[in-house]
Amino acid sequence: MYKRQLEVIEIANKACKDMGIENPRIAVAGLNPHCGENGLFGREEIEEITPAIEAAKAEGITGVVGPCPPDSVFSQAIGGWYDIVVCMYHDQGHIPLKTVGFVYDREKQEWKAVEGVNVTLGLPIIRASVDHGTDFYHAGKGNGNELSLVNAIKYAVKMTGRAN
């Protein structure tokens, strides 16, 4: 059944529109390698993801595409092809975000950049958070990096539609 996938596509569409994107370009990532290779590696793309995309289009969500290969859809989104990517599970979205936003200096053995922000859509409240977790390792040591927190706050403000 594709009910949950359709619901998430609808939530992604609404979130984009709420942030001023009139015609959102929504990529829906596949679950399996190579989007299942027509059922060879899994049937989720055939039985759940594609029907959800077709149902979304029937509802008038015309900018939705997929299933998109999960190993390349994020570089396409960063390149401007898509406004948002619907992922099939938590780490599918977090791995590319952290790969792009986290930079580690091996010589100094410290993080130079920790810029990821994650949001949870479909809640009755706005939720934006740092993408590095609680970071207890740096807590109380005075050596933390506030960039991700500042970015999360700025993004939450943007989500309200009140950003300047």
What are these language model-derived features?
Residues 3-67:
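Glycine-rich phosphate/diphosphate-binding loop of Rossmann-like nucleotide-binding domains
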Residues 52-164:
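Glycine-rich phosphate/nucleotide-binding loop
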